[in-house]
Amino acid sequence: MDIKSQTLYLNLSEAYKDPEVKANEFLSKLVVQCAGKLTASNSENSYIEVISLLSRGISSYYLSHKRIIPSSMLTIYTQIQKDIKNGNIDTEKLRKYEIAKGLMSVPYIYF
């Protein structure tokens, strides 16, 4: 794991220990899912995929819960927004990756 992934993993671990996060099913599942994806693969794509998933998940939670969010999740959100805002995520590259992943999962049909 690179340094960004390790830092994110440690922050996810701290967030999971937070009683507010543990009490909320959506946030605890999001943290576990993202931590699992980070440890499952060492590729840069896994980090990009995880921060995209976290950004969407935290944003939707924030908007649907009257703009209240646990501080540990806010820490993670501000950490990953640096990478997203700096353009470290190449959306075209991510789109091609997702298309390729989808095409690989489609069964081949021979006539």
From Swiss-Prot:
GO-annotated biological processes: bacteriocin immunity
Keywords: Bacteriocin immunity, Plasmid
Protein's UniProt keywords contain Ion transport: no
Parts of the chain that traverse the membrane: none
GO cellular component annotations of the record: cytoplasm; plasma membrane
Superkingdom, taxonomy of origin: Bacteria
Role summary: Could impart immunity to carnobacteriocin-B2 to naturally sensitive host strains.
Name of the protein this chain belongs to: Putative carnobacteriocin-B2 immunity protein
Organism annotation: Carnobacterium maltaromaticum
